């Protein structure tokens, strides 16, 4: 369970949000809102990268400030790839951080990355870099996924693979929060609208 208690974020004297909400296991939530409404900031706060002006975030009934990192898998605008490293080196790096090396090859096969393993990430298109970042969702075992505009620049095939993966995560008890400008293609997802 993920709970936001009186989570407030202000920017330039403007209150972007003041949230009290709980996300239950087995849930998918799209965070929607105009540019500048705080979607990315909210995901960054939940990941622990950014601090709110006030309020608390609890994951599994523990304040995230007291939980050892990493407790979630966050993919933001900066994909977290080491561009000078190969696809395989990047996925190994992340799977070792999460102590989940047994899922590394499942990630490679799910997203059909076998032919790209020795490619440096800087040589990949932005869409393929996002696919490598999305493969991290399998390579890194975590029950909380925070995805910021990950669907952008993906081919239809890779977007479908990602959406199926998101549904599988929720069906296995995970919590998935994602922001997207694209129309929600996961019918079971909830919508959190930021104004």
Swiss-Prot record:
GO terms for biological process: cytochrome complex assembly. Keywords: ATP-binding, Cell inner membrane, Cell membrane, Cytochrome c-type biogenesis, Membrane, Nucleotide-binding, Translocase, Transport. Residues 1-195 form the ABC transporter domain. Its EC number is 7.6.2.5. It is found in: Cell inner membrane. ATP binds at residues 33-40. It catalyses: heme b(in) + ATP + H2O = heme b(out) + ADP + phosphate + H(+). SUPFAM superfamilies: P-loop containing nucleoside triphosphate hydrolases. Belongs to the ABC transporter superfamily. CcmA exporter (TC 3.A.1.107) family. This is Cytochrome c biogenesis ATP-binding export protein CcmA. It comes from Rickettsia felis (strain ATCC VR-1525 / URRWXCal2) (Rickettsia azadi).
